[in-house]
Amino acid sequence: LRDEEQTAESIKNQMTVKEWEKVFEMSQDQNLYHNLCTSLFPTIHGNDEVKRGVLLMLFGGVPKTTGEGTSLRGDINVCIVGDPSTAKSQFLKHVDEFSPRAVYTSGKASSASGLTAAVVRDEESHEFVIEAGALMLADNGVCCIDEFDKMDMRDQVAIHEAMEQQTISITKAGVKATLNARTSILAAANPVSGHYDRSKSLKQNINLSAPIMSRFDLFFILVDECNEVTDYAIARRIVDLHSRIEESIDRVYSLDDIRRYLLFARQFKPKISKESEDFIVEQYKRLRQRDGSGITKSSWRITVRQLESMIRLSESMARMHCCDEVQPKHVKEAFRLLNKSIIRVETPDVNLDQEEEIQMETDEGPGGINGHADSPAPVNGFNGSGEDASQETVPKPSLRLAFAEYCRISNLIVLHLRKMEEEEDESALKRSELVNWYLKEIESEIDSEEELINKKRIIEKVVHRLTHYDHVLIELTQAGLKGSSEGSESYEEDPYLVVNPNYLLED
C-alpha cells in the first residue's frame, strides 16, 4: 500500500484514464466515509464505529521527524475487545485479505522472537543471521494479531518498542541491529471472564499491561447484547450469505477501486491549520478534565499519547478526503471516535437499589436467589404483615436508571446548588427542598400521581447515591449541637446539602 518515493502525480500516471476517473469520482463523493466502510466490510452487520476506526487506520497519519532526529509515528494502532462471536476476527481477516502487505498471526501461538525478529545460524555460511518476525514482515503495512490477550507478558513487552518507536532493536549472539517495523497493529482480545463486565473498567476486563494499552490509539468494545431488532438483522445477513453469496454482498466500490484510492490518498501529507491547532488543544483539555473528575472513570488514563492519537486520526481524515490541510471538521470526527473508545464502556445502567440489595443478601445469607433482591419487604419496614406475606415469592425488581439520565439529573442538581451558592450567602438546601425543587422543574413530564411517586423515589435515590457513593454532594454535619436530641434527629433525617468544592462538572 505504501511507497515513500512515489508522489500523487506518479501514481496518477500509472493508472489508466478509466481508473483515474474512478479515483477522482471517489474523491468528490460527499458520502465517501460511509461508502468506504460499507464497501470494505459488506458481510459484517453494524459495528459502524469499528469500521470507521479500521478505515482510518488504513489511511494512517503523517510520520514526522523532529529537528533532533526523533521520529514521530504516523501509524494508527487499534484494539478490538469484546465478547465471543462479535465479529472481532472477521475484521482482522478482512484487513488481512484486503491489504497487500498485511500479516495475520495469533497471540497465543506467537513468541517474542516470532513477532519481532530472531537470530539463527545460516546453514550455508554458518554465521548468525536475522530472521524477520511478523512485525518486520508487515513493515509499511498492517499486522493483525488475534487473541492478543493470550500472549505471555514477556512476549507483550517485546512489542513495546515496535508499537511506539516503530523499530526493533536486537542484540543477540554478537549481532547488533536496529530494524524498521513501521506497521499499524490491529489487535483482537477477549475479556478476562469470557464476557465483558460493564460494571468494571476496561483495564479490569482485559489481561493487558498499562504500557501496552496506552500505545493503542483506539479501543473498541463489542458487547453481545440481546436485542430483537439487531439479532434479526444479523441472522438475516448470515442466512443471506450462506444462501446467495454473490447477490447478498452489496458494495458501492470494488476492493480494487479502494486499493487504488488508498494508494493515491496516502501520498497527501496534510498540515495542521492554526484553527485546527487551537481546536485540538481545546478538545484535549476537555478529555483531561473529564478524566480527572468525578462520576466516570475513563477506560484508561488520558495522557499525551491520546493527544498524539487525535492528531494522527485528524490527519487520516484529511488524507481520506485528499486534503492538504487538516480542518476543524476532521478534528471533530477524530475527537468523537477517540471519545467513543474512551467513554463507551463506562456507561452501565446505575443500580439505585444497590445498597439495599447488598443489605438483603447479608440478612438472607444463602437463602436468597442470586442476582435478585427478592426478600419480603424489609426495605419498607413492613416485614411480617399479612398483606406482604402473600407477595413474598414475587421478586422485587431493582430500580435502575440509564447512565446518561443519571448524569443529566446530577448535573442539573449541581448547577442549581452552585447557582444558589453564587446568589445567596446561605446556599445550602435541605434534602427535601432539593427534591421538591427538582419535581417542580419536571412537573410538565408528570401526568399522574403514580408517576409523581415514582419520580420522587428516583430523585431521592439519586441524591442518596450522589452523597454516599459518588461524593458529589456533602451533608453538613451538626457539630457541637448535640444538646438538643430532638433537633439533631430531625436534622439527620433531612440534612442540608452542598456541592463538594473539588467536584468538576461533567460536559
Swiss-Prot record:
O-glycosylated (O-GlcNAcylated), in a cell cycle-dependent manner. The modification N6-acetyllysine is found at residue 329. ATP binds at residues 45, 85-89, 190. The keyword Nucleotide-binding applies. Residues 365-392 are annotated as: Disordered. It catalyses: ATP + H2O = ADP + phosphate + H(+). A motif (Arginine finger) lies at residues 214-217. ADP binds at residues 305, 308. GO terms for cellular component: CMG complex; MCM complex; nucleus. GO terms for molecular function: ATP binding; ATP hydrolysis activity; helicase activity; identical protein binding; single-stranded DNA binding. The modification Phosphoserine is found at residues 375, 390, 448. Its EC number is 3.6.4.12. GO terms for biological process: DNA replication. Keywords: Acetylation, ATP-binding, Cell cycle, Chromosome, DNA replication, DNA-binding, Glycoprotein, Helicase, Hydrolase, Nucleotide-binding, Nucleus, Phosphoprotein. It is an enzyme of class 3 (hydrolase). It is found in: Nucleus; Chromosome. Residues 32-239 form the MCM domain. The modification Phosphothreonine is found at residue 477. InterPro entries: MCM (IPR031327), Mcm6_C (IPR041024), MCM_CS (IPR018525), MCM_dom (IPR001208), MCM_lid (IPR041562), P-loop_NTPase (IPR027417). Component of the MCM2-7 complex. The complex forms a toroidal hexameric ring with the proposed subunit order MCM2-MCM6-MCM4-MCM7-MCM3-MCM5. Component of the CMG helicase complex, a hexameric ring of related MCM2-7 subunits stabilized by CDC45 and the tetrameric GINS complex. May interact with MCM10. Interacts with TIPIN. Interacts with CDT1. Interacts with MCMBP. Interacts with DDI2. Belongs to the MCM family. Early fractionation of eukaryotic MCM proteins yielded a variety of dimeric, trimeric and tetrameric complexes with unclear biological significance. Specifically a MCM467 subcomplex is shown to have in vitro helicase activity which is inhibited by the MCM2 subunit. The MCM2-7 hexamer is the proposed physiological active complex. Acts as a component of the MCM2-7 complex (MCM complex) which is the replicative helicase essential for 'once per cell cycle' DNA replication initiation and elongation in eukaryotic cells. Core component of CDC45-MCM-GINS (CMG) helicase, the molecular machine that unwinds template DNA during replication, and around which the replisome is built. This is DNA replication licensing factor MCM6. It comes from Rattus norvegicus. The gene is Mcm6.
